[in-house]
């Protein structure tokens, strides 16, 4: 199962200088480094504090777990070893990631779970956040039509918070797709134990604390109380972080299920704290939340079946759309990260992003031409417009092809069940509001709405903002599980997932090599092609020069840059189940 977190969608702040302002600590939180509980736990960083570029993958015979953090991977593995299935493990991983990767996802967020059961059942559980009923398209705008609070009102503070869906989505999965062999308590116990006993801070988490330190010592000191040390300074790699408040909250959910979170004391604490930062989330908003149960978006690519996430995520739609375009080329013969290949990828990405802006939204509020956008005939029209020169793209006309009729982890078990999940609190540390005495962070998911009141993706009460989350499962021609893949990364999510799929199918790469491979991103703005240095099959200066000669603008990113996501994937082969994890973040795959 592949769980992907939408991170890094927002800009990052400068690293902290020493502050004289102490961070307020929750009465129940323990923020003092202690001796490591387990010294032999694999670390994502080397002795110099740099992310390891190797040791991320593994081979399994009876199952595979790959997540954005080794502690979450171990939580999923523990549940599988106790006899749980891939869905049980996915639930355990989700709660565990909220403990050890709190900057990226957790109880205050939402996501999508893509499930393929060995008996043929398929479903996408959409537990995306929704806008509070009291908000509308003008919520954030001042009299001149600009976003309030210096442009921050839609992603920092109370007006950025959507109704969280994680607990409701996981409860639906537990009730309908879990093995039935394990109780909720057993599935959640690894996360509860981790919050109580502690986990070692990895490089990505430490970087996120440093990047947002200023928030933690000024307006959002409850957040700082949980994620700064006793001296109100950022943790260092290898320090052990505990969160007893979060452990207590998880225990309440383990005992009381969905109602324990959406009604009663936890819900009231959410409403009160969000209101203290100007929000309008209500008890009624929380009590009425239900996940949406959807059919996946489907397509094919060179004989493989693509099964991905439907709206309100745009991701699955555009993965199918761009692969349909690429199918018109012999990508394998064109080579890995050659100028010819990257030019085609760039033009196809621009076309898909133009369609995204024009058509994609919550289908409960807008007509989305889904059949047209995923049609091979429509993709052929895009292919026919691609020339040897870079060009600007406007939205196409997919309606003409309509018939009658949008952190990452993956888990697979011995029975052939496979799950791919993407979940998030949106930007790193969400809206920056932590719930005191309960230990979790609220999302800033409303940031994904367009601030233009005329947009198809404008803010409306009860509406889900457009997402790029793309937990994807690939099946072979006979319908057997072949691959599971997902990634965080905001708008880079679906381009990343599509590139990894192509690396496996077109270039015959192993799962880890497909993830390690250098990536690009192009959405048609002034940055042009964003490209990273480093990585496997490194993009060379000669290739960049050739792209510039074709009229492409280019923007160089860093080496192994987390801008391009943190992909986790599983590949089924005759030699075993391959698990791959992204060295751009703290991910680790473990098989059994």
Per-region residue spans from a language model:
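Internal maturation/activation junctions in enzymes
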Residues: 42, 328-425, 437-438, 445, ...
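Bacterial signal peptide processing site
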Residues: 11-13
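Noncatalytic scaffold domains of N-terminal-nucleophile
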Residues: 34-74, 86-87, 91-256, 261-263, ...
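Extended C-terminal subregions enriched in glycine
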Residues: 415, 463-465, 497, 506-561
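Short, small/polar residue-rich loop motifs at catalytic or cofactor-binding pockets
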Residues: 292-293, 403-406, 467-469
């Amino acid at each position: 199962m592949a769980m992907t977190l939408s991170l890094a969608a927002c800009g990052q702040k400068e690293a902290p200088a020493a502050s004289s302002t102490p961070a307020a600590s929750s009465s129940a939180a323990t923020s003092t480094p202690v001796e490591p509980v387990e010294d032999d736990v694999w670390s994502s960083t080397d002795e110099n504090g740099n992310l390891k570029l190797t040791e991320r993958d593994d081979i399994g015979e009876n199952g595979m777990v790959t997540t954005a953090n080794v502690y979450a991977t171990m939580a999923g593995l523990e549940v599988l070893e106790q006899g749980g299935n891939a869905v049980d493990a996915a639930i355990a991983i989700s709660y565990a990631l909220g403990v050890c990767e709190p900057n990226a996802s957790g109880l205050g967020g939402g996501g999508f779970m893509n499930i393929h059961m060995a008996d043929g059942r398929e479903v996408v559980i959409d537990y995306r956040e929704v806008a509070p009923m009291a908000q509308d398209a003008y919520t954030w705008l001042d009299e001149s039509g600009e976003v309030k609070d210096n442009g921050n009102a839609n992603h920092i503070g109370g007006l950025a918070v959507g109704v969280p869906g994680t607990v409701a989505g996981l409860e639906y999965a537990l009730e309908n797709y879990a093995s039935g062999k394990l109780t909720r308590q057993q599935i959640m116990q690894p996360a509860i134990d981790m919050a109580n006993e502690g986990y070692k801070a990895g490089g990505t988490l430490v970087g996120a604390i440093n990047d947002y330190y200023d928030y933690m010592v000024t307006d959002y000191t409850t957040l700082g109380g949980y994620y700064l040390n006793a001296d109100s300074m950022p943790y260092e790699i290898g320090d052990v972080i505990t969160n007893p408040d979060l452990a207590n909250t998880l225990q309440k959910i383990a005992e009381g299920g969905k109602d324990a979170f959406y009604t009663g004391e936890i819900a009231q604490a959410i409403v009160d704290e969000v209101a203290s930062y100007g929000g309008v989330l209500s008890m009624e908003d929380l009590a009425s939340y239900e996940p949406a149960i959807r059919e996946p978006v489907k397509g094919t690519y060179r004989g493989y079946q693509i099964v991905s996430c439907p709206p309100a995520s745009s991701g699955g739609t555009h993965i199918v759309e761009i692969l349909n375009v690429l199918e018109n080329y012999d990508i394998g013969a064109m080579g890995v990260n050659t100028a010819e290949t990257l030019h085609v990828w760039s033009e196809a990405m621009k076309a898909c992003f133009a369609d995204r802006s024009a058509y994609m939204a919550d289908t409960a509020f807008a007509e989305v031409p889904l059949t047209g956008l995923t049609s091979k005939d429509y993709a052929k029209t895009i292919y026919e417009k691609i020339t040897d020169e870079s060009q600007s793209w406007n939205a196409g006309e997919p309606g003409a092809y309509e018939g009658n009729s949008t952190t990452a982890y993956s888990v697979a078990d011995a029975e052939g069940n496979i799950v791919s999940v993407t979940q998030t609190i949106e930007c790193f540390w969400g809206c920056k509001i932590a719930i005191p005495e309960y230990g979790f962070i609220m999302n800033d998911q409303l940031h994904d709405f367009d601030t233009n009141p005329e947009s198809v993706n404008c803010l409306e009460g009860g509406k889900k903002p457009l997402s790029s989350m793309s937990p994807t499962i690939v099946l072979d021609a006979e319908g057997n599980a072949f691959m599971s893949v997902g990634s965080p990364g905001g708008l880079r999510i679906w381009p990343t997932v599509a590139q990894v799929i192509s690396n496996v199918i077109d270039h015959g790469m192993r799962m880890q090599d497909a993830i390690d491979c250098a990536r690009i991103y192009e959405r048609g703005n002034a940055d042009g092609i964003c490209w990273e240095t480093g990585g496997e099959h490194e993009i060379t200066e000669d290739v960049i020069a050739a792209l510039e000669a074709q009229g492409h603008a280019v923007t160089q990113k860093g080496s192994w840059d987390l801008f391009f996501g943190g992909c986790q994937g599983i590949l089924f082969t005759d030699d075993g189940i391959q698990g791959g994890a992204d060295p751009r973040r703290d991910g680790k795959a473990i098989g059994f």
